[in-house]
Regions:
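Active-site segments that bind and position negatively charged phosphate/pyrophosphate groups
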Residues: 1-107
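Mobile late-domain/C-terminal helix-loop "cap" segments
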Residues: 62-167
Length: 167
């Protein structure tokens, strides 16, 4: 709600304060949790291909959520309420809420991309080549963040995720 306001009008002090508070809350939550596969791949993309971490997270999050879906269905389903609101949550059958959460994130990401020009695929970054996927996957497998991912991932599965977010 506030991010578009700040992008459109950087002088909107109320929206900027709301964004600062959101950043503080996110940082606090992040500091008290482990990360997982999305960060392991993101760290590798940064190291191997020099993709900014925030861009990598934006590109990877929906695909990695899809990868983890069977292990995280209930938790993902709970996120639908704050993301989409009570009407959408109530209208979505419980067994479909997790996928609806991912779909909602993809739609929100596209709105943000339309507003800011943020890339939504690896090819749009201009920094990644498909020939680098093997090295990125190997690097991600050696990242400590991968240990806490709900679903184990191997080299081929990580390469598959990279292919999925390529174009």
């Amino acid at each position: 709600e506030n991010l578009p306001k700040v992008v459109e009008n950087g002088q909107d002090k109320a929206a900027r304060l709301a964004m600062a508070n959101a950043s503080l809350m996110a940082g606090t939550a992040f500091g008290n949790s482990m990360v997982g596969l999305v960060h392991a791949i993101g760290h590798a993309l940064g190291g191997v291909c020099h993709v900014a971490h925030g861009e990598a997270m934006t590109i990877l999050l929906p695909a990695v959520m899809k990868y983890n879906l069977e292990k995280c269905k209930e938790r993902y389903g709970e996120l639908l309420l704050p993301l989409a609101g009570p009407e959408v949550y109530a209208a979505t059958p419980a067994e479909l809420r997790a996928q609806k959460t991912i779909d909602t994130l993809v739609a929100l990401r596209q709105q943000l991309a339309d507003l800011t020009g943020l890339p939504t695929t690896l090819s749009q970054t201009g920094r990644v080549k498909p020939e680098q996927f093997d090295e990125v996957a190997s690097t991600a497998l050696n990242d400590g963040a991968i240990i806490v991912n709900p679903a184990e991932a191997n080299h081929e599965e990580i390469v598959g995720i990279l292919r999925e977010v390529w174009a």
